[in-house]
Regions:
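Acidic/histidine-rich, surface-exposed loop or edge segments in extracytoplasmic proteins
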Residues: 3-13
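PDZ/PDZ-like domain segments forming the peptide/carboxylate-binding groove
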Residues: 51-92, 96-101, 163
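Generic structural signal for buried aliphatic residues
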Residues: 90-91, 118, 301
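Extended, small/polar residue-biased N-terminal targeting/export presequences
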Residues: 12-71, 115-119, 123-147, 336-339
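Cleft-lining beta-strand/loop regions that shape enzyme active-site pockets
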Residues: 80, 85, 94-97, 104-281
Length: 339
């Protein structure tokens, strides 16, 4: 085959004697990443490594070939306090170039024993020179859901969809003023479970399809909404952007389709997938995407994500967010009446 001919030519005619094992491994890893940035090839020595530890830098990275981008940061965590923000580019971790490692290995480098320091070479937004930042790993304490209210409406910030967030969210719903607009901020949200996302959707949506889970050589699995109460009558605004990822994308889609929500911001990440691990005969494994998701509005959230109804590039400072949204909403309503 052409592939074997290429390998033979590299081995026989390259200017220096190549390490063919590294050539082949790099080629396989590159092919896997082209299929999906979460895919990884793990060799036997990778699998024999001890767990790095439970402390974390408080950020989620997504590998993009020779670099990584920050997908989300945990509010109040080490990365957040150091000024890292979603969308920033990271080129090296502890001096190691990211083009030489898998997505699996990259994530492990951001974990370790509490107090461990890692060096991050990063490119903050709107800069051309790299900045080195030291992060000290911590056992992350996730803050409560953000909640702000005023006489005109309320804002709930969902920075993750971990276990228990659905109950916490339900409690906050009981504090809302009747018929006042609710702003649900799903930005900077990439962690959580399908169950929690579905439970929150059941609190705000009418009956219907929540998501379709697609796997190779298996029937599609449809998850449906089964709300115990009628859909609340409040006006619902969902904030989203490229840091809205995974199950948060399914929640945004369901709220848009069955909760009559309007989505503001920009398109979500398009990373609605689940990984699986396949053992290999020589002791290694493939960690690859084995399930892809479709949203309630038939969006392919594994690729294109959920589009925003109202594009907004800059929401302004966080402490003014609720006023900005409600002022914009009021201007939109007044403009519609005038027309």
């Amino acid at each position: 085959s052409d592939l074997q001919d290429i390998l033979d030519l590299i081995n026989d005619r390259y200017v220096e004697v190549p390490d063919m094992e590294l050539v082949i491994k790099g080629g396989i890893q590159s092919a896997l990443e082209r299929s999906h940035p979460f895919n990884s090839w793990l060799n036997a020595s990778d699998l024999s490594e001890e767990d790095p530890g439970g402390a974390s830098a408080g950020m989620t990275l997504i590998k993009r070939g020779i670099y990584a981008s920050v997908l989300t940061v945990v509010p109040g965590g080490p990365a957040d306090r150091a000024g890292l923000r979603p969308g920033e580019v990271i080129r090296r971790l502890n001096g190691l170039s990211l083009n030489k490692i898998s997505a699996w290995k990259m994530q492990r480098l951001t974990r370790g024993p509490e107090g461990t320091e890692i060096e991050v070479q990063r490119y903050p937004k709107d800069t051309v020179e790299p900045v080195k930042t030291i992060l000290k790993l911590e056992n992350i304490k996730f803050p409560p859901l953000g909640f702000q209210t005023s006489s005109r409406g309320s804002l709930i910030t969902l920075s993750d969809l971990r276990a228990g967030r659905d109950k916490e969210f339900n409690t906050l719903l009981g504090r809302l003023s009747p018929n006042q607009p609710l702003i649900l901020d799903l930005r900077n949200n990439s962690e959580g479970t399908m169950e929690v996302a579905l439970n929150i959707a059941n609190l705000l949506c009418s009956e219907g399809l929540f998501a379709t889970l697609r796997s190779t050589n298996k029937p599609n699995v449809n998850l449906t909404l089964t709300p115990s109460n009628p859909r609340p009558s409040m006006k619902l605004i969902v904030l989203q952007d490229s840091s809205t990822s995974g199950v948060a994308e399914l929640l945004a889609s369901a709220l848009k389709r069955h909760g009559k929500a309007k989505t503001w911001g920009s398109q979500t990440a398009g990373l609605g997938v689940a990984l699986g691990r396949i053992p290999l005969s020589q002791g290694g494994a493939l960690e690859i995407v084995m399930e892809r998701w479709t949203g309630a509005g038939r969006e392919e959230v594994d690729q294109t994500g959920v589009k925003a109804d109202k594009p907004i590039k800059d929401f302004g400072p966080q402490d003014r967010l609720i006023d900005f949204i409600l002022d914009t909403l009021n201007d939109t309503v007044q403009g519609s009446k005038a027309s």
